[in-house]
Amino acid sequence: MAHDFLLILLFSHIISTNVHACNQTERASLLSFASTLSSRPLNWTSVNCCHWKGITCNKDGLVTHLLLSSKGLKGDIFPSSSSLGNLKCLTHLNLSHNSLSGSLETEFFSSLDRLKILDLSFNLLSGKLPFSLPSHNIQTLDLSSNRFHGAIPSSFFQQARNLTSFNVHNNSFSGLIPSSICLQSSPLIRLLDFSLNEFNGSISPGFGKCSKLQVFRAGNNILSGLLPKDIYNATKLEEIAFPFNSLHGAISEKIFNLTNLAILDLSFNQLSGLLPLHFGKLSKLKLLTLDDNHFEGYLPPSLMNCTNLVEIHMATNNLEGDISMLNFSRLSHLSKIDLHQNHFTGTFPTSLYSCQSLKAIRFTANNLKGQIQPEILSLKSLSFLSLIGLTNITGAMKILMHCKSLQILWLAYSFKGEEMLADEGVVDFGGFQNLRVLGFFNCELTGQMPSWLSKLKNVEILFLTGSRITGPIPRSLGTLPKLFYLSLAHNRISGEFPKELCRLPRLVHEEPTTTQVDDYVDLRIFPHSSLIYQQRLSSIPPTLNLSFNYIHGRVPTEIGQIHLVHNLDLSGNNFSGNIPEQISNLKNLEKLSLSINHLSGNIPLSLASLNFLNYFNVSYNNLEGPIPTGTQLQSFNDSAFEGNPKLCGSPLLNECLPINGVDADSKNNQGVDSEHQFPWLYIFTALGFIVGFWGVCGSLIVKKTWRYAYFKFLENVQDRLHVKITVLMTMMKRRLRGA
């Protein structure tokens, strides 16, 4: 019985092996395809190609799937793919994330007319698309992240009646976005992604005919004109994303037709008008992003009915109204709210404390007032809080230091008459332990900088500008392991420049990639940051700004150790002495400001090696000599050097005078060079004096007989000189008389 069972198993295995055996013609075609491309070894060595990695066959042993994503494939796609035309049942072809080049010809699609899924994304393909897509079966076509260019012919989709997804994101396509995709063909289309290209003109009517369309993306183009009216007829739409264009006009009240809409992103356009009153009918809305437009009026109260909202982005518009009148408590899923730079009034809405999912709040640059309540501690996930513009806040630090998840904190125009939280006021300090950015801008904080700041081991940006902080800079700040941006400008800080700041690890050593964490934060970091400084800490240049304080003494030579700093601003202090030559070690320096101090001496020639310097200012010091010639220092405006009467040379009108027939620049530059040369002449002179003095005088002091002989010798020399001079004078008188 057992013997019969084994025979049945063996027979079944033979049958299954024969059924799935690879077709030899197709095996040869696959090997031919691989041979025309360079790649990492595919390990296609076994007899049965159906067992090869990336290959799937049907029951007849014919290849249906060829999935070679991220295999390091290189070469021209068209000659290599011609052999794939023998794969008559191939329905899925994925060659994404490789380095394939060349263009797509009509023959490419003709030879693969059974394809349903074609993914060629993230390659180096280029050229224009063919006149038409000669495939009736194609359902998904992904050409994103390549180098295609030119217009997409309206005829391209004429035969693609089963197309459901078309993605050309991140190419260089231009011209109009083809609306004919819905008018003449592809009635089943569900996804259209034209974003990050060079499409221009207006969005033509026709997309309203896409009755199945769910996702429509066309952001980061050069689109203009109004939103197409018929887009509100595409009632299946779940996502509309047209950011970073030049669209204008208003959002129609007909938007309430799009009851399936979950994502609406129209940020960074020129849209205007009032927000639709019926936003509340979009019950599935999760992401509302209307930043950087010209919307005006009130935030519709009906928006509070969109209980699935996760993010609200309305920054940089002209919206107004009492924000405290809105009831946010129903938005239990709300994670981020950004109302930066509008005209909202009222107090901080306490109903936000009920939004337990909140991670980020940015209400900067509005006209809000009021206090931060202890209830904010109920927001356990709060990591980003920016309330610049919420004026006259007091006592907030004692509350916020207990927000355990807080990473970014920005406050401004507050703390009137309030002292910095002193060390004695902090018992077993455990607050702000996750803080990465601490920013107090134009506050009225007084008192000295507390040493508890040195316990913020995760802080990367410390921005305490425009307050009334006094006393010296704590040396312990130099121990902060992650600090790379320190701004203490416009305070009343005194004392000397602490050398410990020149040992800040993130300014001295490149952070190992193995220790870097995700530097993405929830919202834009700086209140008025450019797009460059969006939401990554790594995009912010390492900075040391101590300007406009009362710091005195010399700029330490150790300043040359902070190799990674991009911006160094010590202006408006009482620094004296020479400009340290070691500043030339800061090869990444882009901004150097030493103006309005008491610095003296020459401008070091070595500063000419700072190749990335685009801002330089040493005005109003006591510098002298020539401005180094033949360097980019002379490319700066004369205002960068004014206020130094003894400074000369271009770009100043004060020319350097010649010295002893030698060109003044040459002579003075020699003086600049000699300033930094080791003073060997003085050393050797001193050594000679010491050796001569002690060689003679020392021996006279030690040995009495030598001393007696020496003075006897001097007496004899004196007598002889007296005799010779007397004889010489007598002879001269006689000659004069004889004359």
Question: What does each of the following model-derived ranges do?
Answer:
Residues 1-739:
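Plant-biased, solvent-exposed loop and capping regions
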